[in-house]
Amino acid sequence: MTILGIGLDLVTISEFAEQLERTGTTMLRESFTAGERRYCQSKGTDPARSYAARWAAKEAVLKAWASSRFARRPQIGDNPYPLIEVVNDAWGRPSIKLHGLAAEFLPRVRVHLSLTHDGDTAAAMVVLEDPGELADLIEGREATP
């Protein structure tokens, strides 16, 4: 088991809410999956808190992925945000589901996620863990049997 990368991101909820409310913005549609939009809208009068936490999670995943590829291009694409989805289990615990290029570039990686809100701040912490031989593949080494 190897830690491949760590990512942390903070979002100011009020500033994020302003961005979402701008006339003509396509951020929700272009950055969040339909499932994420349904979840956030179900959170009552302040969906921006949930959107901000999910945005922080997406950014934290990208930072963790980039740190795992130090001095090399991350290669996830021009708009990776809808490829990184925050999902919740039956008890509300969040986790990351990767799609498309993100899933291809991070095969077999375990993504640990923690989200929090406090006052006007949402935060996410992500740890990418290789449960086996992936670190060797990323570094270009021959995987050991």
From Swiss-Prot:
Gene Ontology CC terms, in alphabetical order: cytoplasm
InterPro entries from the UniProt entry: 4-PPantetheinyl_Trfase_dom, 4-PPantetheinyl_Trfase_dom_sf, ACPS, Ppantetheine-prot_Trfase_dom
NCBIfam families in the cross-refs: pantethn_trn, PRK00070.3-1
Catalytic reaction list: apo-[ACP] + CoA = holo-[ACP] + adenosine 3',5'-bisphosphate + H(+)
Name the UniProt record assigns to this protein: Holo-[acyl-carrier-protein] synthase
Organism: Nocardia farcinica (strain IFM 10152)
Signal peptide positions on this chain: none
Cofactors required: Mg(2+)
Functional summary from the UniProt entry: Transfers the 4'-phosphopantetheine moiety from coenzyme A to a Ser of acyl-carrier-protein.
Annotated localization: Cytoplasm
Entry keywords, A to Z: Cytoplasm, Fatty acid biosynthesis, Fatty acid metabolism, Lipid biosynthesis, Lipid metabolism, Magnesium, Metal-binding, Transferase
One Pfam family hit: ACPS
Any single GO BP term: fatty acid biosynthetic process
Gene expressing this chain: acpS
Its EC number(s): 2.7.8.7
Main location, first listed in the record: cytoplasm
Protein family per UniProt: Belongs to the P-Pant transferase superfamily. AcpS family.
Top-level taxonomy: Bacteria, Bacillati, Actinomycetota, Actinomycetes, Mycobacteriales
Coiled coil: none
